[in-house]
Amino acid sequence: ALPPVCVHTPLEATIALQGHPPVHVKVQRTLLTDQGDTRVYAQTLASSEAHVSLPLGTRVPGTYMYHIMGTSDAYYADARPDTKALEYRVWPQPQAAWAPATPARRSACLGDTWAQAPTLQLRGTPPFRVDIEARPVHTEGHADAMRFTHTVHGTQWAVALPAPFQVPGTWEVRVLRVEDAHCRQDGSQPPPVVVDVVESAGVVAPTTREHYCVGERMDFVLQGTPPWTVTYTFDGATSRVTSR
């Protein structure tokens, strides 16, 4: 048996030939797919050399078996099949996808990670190594992308960022690469999750004044994303106002 390989890995075998050229070799390939299907394919190779190359299939994950069903040369034909088989395993590439109903856009507060982490579903053989990038798209200041690798021992992971968002604006969180116990997937990753990072709601006084005249207005600066609802107490009475 040959060592297992990942899907789409180039692979071939060399068959030694004896006889008067040209020598013809009948080969039968049997594929047992991971879905339980059996596929049989026959082909004939011809060569005037002492060896002939046999391309081996790796396009579909599963177990492959090759048998030589018969040979013939310029003078003789041997229809007896070879009892020995060439066998090997083709592993599928791991896959990652966001769990169903995961919103394509979510929000997070400045200086914090997201309140509800999206769940990444993984297909393959654990453990998985997942490369994640959180990169700024449109921010209110300079921000560096965050890249990190996380090992997942199951098939689901609630994506937790290693550091909080430090700059408000729009960020994208994307899967760069997924690797399982056998293979690696660099392309065909799920679409990114867009994160709107906003300042936490707050009320800031623009001045340190403590005394005001009767009828004079007291101004405050609102932090966060409108509309704001502010509840305050003055002279023993509680009031609520909305500002847009």
Regions found by a protein language model. Give the residues of each.
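Extracellular low-complexity Ser/Thr/Asn/Gly-rich intrinsically disordered segments
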Residues: 1-244
